[in-house]
From Swiss-Prot:
Protein name in the entry: Ran-specific GTPase-activating protein
Residue ranges the record marks as coiled coil: none
Residue numbers bearing the N-acetylalanine modification: A2
Highest classification ranks of the organism: Eukaryota, Metazoa, Chordata, Craniata, Vertebrata
Every RanBD1 domain range: 26-164
Gene name of the record: Ranbp1
Record field: compositional bias (Acidic residues): 193-203
Species annotation: Mus musculus (Mouse)
Leftover remarks: Htf9a (RanBP1) and Htf9c are transcribed with opposite polarity from complementary DNA strands from a shared bidirectional TATA-less promoter.
């Protein structure tokens, strides 16, 4: 009897195992969401430089002004394909939150930070990291002196390019707009003169 009972229990157990092995639940999402295309505004820009670094800002608004870390990530120099403007953009790792976003201008100058050969300090009159533009004193630190020098070299190239571009005056788009304005003014003047001539003929 004991043997029969054991064999019955074994049979039940094997049946349960069979049921578990055959159980293959399929979970379907209740609501299917379409994929959203995420735009970073970098699609219209050419990447001139990219390197990992750590960024700081000088918190002068504090009672005791000090350097505060803004984040670690890739710093980029991006040139707009149509406008020709160049900006510095840096996002934090993982969160991708912007910690620096400003245009390169001819007046910007990189200076060594406390004599370090792998860090630079500079001023910007309008940093858009917090969406609202505001002046900032920023510092950036690289892994080594070689990387820091590569950044400085490319930064200076961009600064000089913007300086030369401003010396040449307005770009093609600006000139095209001015030509269109002149043509419009000319058309208005011609129409006015034609109306005056017709008025004189009637008299």
């Amino acid at each position: 009897m004991a043997a029969a009972k054991d064999s019955h229990e074994d049979h039940d157990t094997s049946t349960e195992n069979a049921d578990e092995s055959n159980h293959d639940p399929q979970f379907e999402p209740i609501v299917s969401l379409p994929e959203q295309e995420i735009k970073t505004l970098e699609e219209d820009e050419e990447e001139l430089f990219k390197m990992r670094a750590k960024l700081f800002r000088f918190a002068s608004e504090n009672d005791l002004p000090e350097w505060k870390e803004r984040g670690t990530g890739d710093v980029k120099l991006l040139k707009h394909k149509e406008k020709g403007t160049i900006r510095l953009l840096m996002r934090r790792d993982k969160t991708l939150k912007i910690c620096a976003n400003h245009y390169i201008t001819p007046m910007m100058e990189l200076k060594p930070n406390a004599g370090s050969d792998r860090a630079w300090v500079w001023n910007t009159h309008a940093d858009f990291a917090d969406e609202c533009p505001k002046p900032e004193l920023l510092a950036i630190r690289f892994l080594n002196a070689e990387n820091a020098q590569k950044f400085k070299t490319k930064f200076e190239e961009c600064r000089k390019e913007i300086e030369e571009r401003e010396k040449k005056g307005p770009g093609k788009n600006d000139n095209a707009e001015k030509v269109a304005e002149k043509l419009e003014a000319l058309s208005v003047r011609e129409a006015r003169e034609e109306a005056e001539e017709k008025s004189e003929e009637k008299q």
